[in-house]
From Swiss-Prot:
Species of provenance: Homo sapiens
Record flagged with keyword Membrane: yes
Name of the protein described by the UniProt record: BLOC-1-related complex subunit 7
Subunit structure: Component of the BLOC-one-related complex (BORC) which is composed of BLOC1S1, BLOC1S2, BORCS5, BORCS6, BORCS7, BORCS8, KXD1 and SNAPIN.
Subcellular location: Lysosome membrane
Misc. comment: Diaskedin is from the ancient Greek diaskedazo, meaning to disperse.
Main location: membrane
The keyword Membrane is annotated on this UniProt entry: yes
Biological function: As part of the BORC complex may play a role in lysosomes movement and localization at the cell periphery. Associated with the cytosolic face of lysosomes, the BORC complex may recruit ARL8B and couple lysosomes to microtubule plus-end-directed kinesin motor.
């Protein structure tokens, strides 16, 4: 090593090593901070994906519930149409009976 050099050259070498070491420590610290930010960002992305998946499941349930409600409403509509037809027939028959009754009473 530099053990045989002059004290002045050893001091310069020591300062140079300290400077390089400080630079490397700073770079390493910066890299650790960047890595930590990336891990936290990845963790947040994972949270967001989980929340999106939960929201998607809720939306799917809402859609299924809506489909079920629409099926029930279609059945109710069909029943109401049958009832309307029956009422209409009864009104027509009532009108015919009224005419027959009026004819008999004359």
């Amino acid at each position: 090593m530099m053990a045989t050099g002059t004290p002045e050259s050893q001091a310069r070498f020591g300062q140079s090593v300290k400077g390089l070491l400080t630079e490397k420590v700073t770079t390493c610290g910066t890299d650790v901070i960047a890595l930590t930010k990336q891990v936290l960002k990845g963790s947040r992305s994972s949270e967001l994906l989980g929340q999106a998946a939960r929201n998607m499941v809720l939306q799917e349930d809402a859609i299924l519930h809506s489909e079920d409600s629409l099926r029930k409403m279609a059945i109710i509509t069909t029943h109401l149409q049958y009832q309307q037809e029956a009422i209409q027939k009864n009104v027509e028959q009532s009108s015919d009976l009224q005419d027959q009754l009026n004819h008999l009473l004359k």
